[in-house]
């Protein structure tokens, strides 16, 4: 994977010296080709490795899922408390204003 990219990147080095505009165009095309080659090699060669990684990630995700509902409940409770506090403050505040006027 990396070796292919290295060869391509070194190949477009002298091309930039001959013409900057052409060099940039060719380098971009070669970069795209390099990326596509990496994707193909990853999808074909790395399937077995990815499966092992996914199993580890699933275990971590399960722990996160257990924590998310707890956080969600806390987040839901916080706005309710704020609203009730605002309502409590909002109701008595107009009363003194009325007495002043």
UniProtKB/Swiss-Prot annotation:
Q: Among the record's GO biological process terms, what is one?
A: spermatogenesis
Is Secreted given among the entry's keywords?
no
What keywords are annotated for this sequence in UniProt? Chromosome, Developmental protein, Differentiation, DNA condensation, DNA-binding, Nucleosome core, Nucleus, Phosphoprotein, Spermatogenesis
Q: Which residues carry this modification: Phosphoserine?
A: 93
Q: Where in the cell is it found?
A: Nucleus; Chromosome
Biased composition of type Acidic residues is found at 45-67
- Record's Gene Ontology CC terms? cytoplasm; nucleosome; nucleus
Q: Where is this region: Disordered?
A: 1-101
Question: Which molecular-function annotation in GO is an example for this chain?
Answer: DNA binding
**Main function:** Protamines substitute for histones in the chromatin of sperm during the haploid phase of spermatogenesis. They compact sperm DNA into a highly condensed, stable and inactive complex.
* PANTHER family assigned to the protein according to its UniProt record, in alphabetical order: PROTAMINE-3, SPERM PROTAMINE P3
The record's similarity note reads: Belongs to the protamine P3 family.
The identity of this protein, by name, is: Protamine-3
Source organism phylogeny = Eukaryota, Metazoa, Chordata, Craniata, Vertebrata
């Amino acid at each position: 994977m990396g070796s292919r990219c290295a060869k391509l990147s070194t190949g477009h080095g002298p091309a930039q010296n001959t013409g900057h505009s052409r060099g940039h165009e060719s380098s971009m095309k070669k970069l795209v080709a390099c990326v596509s080659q990496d994707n193909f090699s990853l999808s074909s060669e790395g399937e077995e490795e990815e499966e092992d990684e996914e199993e580890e990630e699933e275990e971590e995700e399960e722990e996160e899922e257990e924590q998310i509902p707890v956080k969600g409940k806390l987040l839901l409770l916080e706005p309710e408390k704020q609203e009730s506090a605002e309502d409590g403050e909002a109701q008595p505040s107009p009363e003194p204003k009325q007495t002043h006027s």
